[in-house]
Design a protein with these regions (language model features):
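Intrinsically disordered, compositionally biased low-complexity regions
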Residues: 2-84
Length: 84
């Protein structure tokens, strides 16, 4: 399984990391906002299955700060809708 340092190397400096038994949630907040604000976060779910790591985004939105960090477990995660 990836550790925090590996996750940071894959994604440039997330604002917050939530490590779970199965992987990580990484949060990126819109400039000038914080963890407790609503609808300001891009959330990435990283899971390691064997030697493969998947990177999925809340509803596949990989360039939008539409989500709330405290609701991260309630979103569906999918592969990116567009390349950035």
């Amino acid at each position: 399984m990836l550790n925090n340092i590996d996750a940071l190397m894959i994604y440039n400096s997330p604002d917050i990391v939530d490590e779970r038994e199965w992987g990580f949630y990484l949060g990126y907040f819109a400039k000038g906002t914080k963890e407790t604000d609503a609808n300001n976060c891009m959330i990435v779910e990283m899971r390691t299955i064997g030697n493969i790591t998947t990177k999925k985004y809340a509803h596949g939105e990989n360039a939008s700060f539409l989500y709330t960090w405290s609701e991260r477990e309630n979103y569906e995660y999918d592969f990116p809708l567009k390349n950035i």
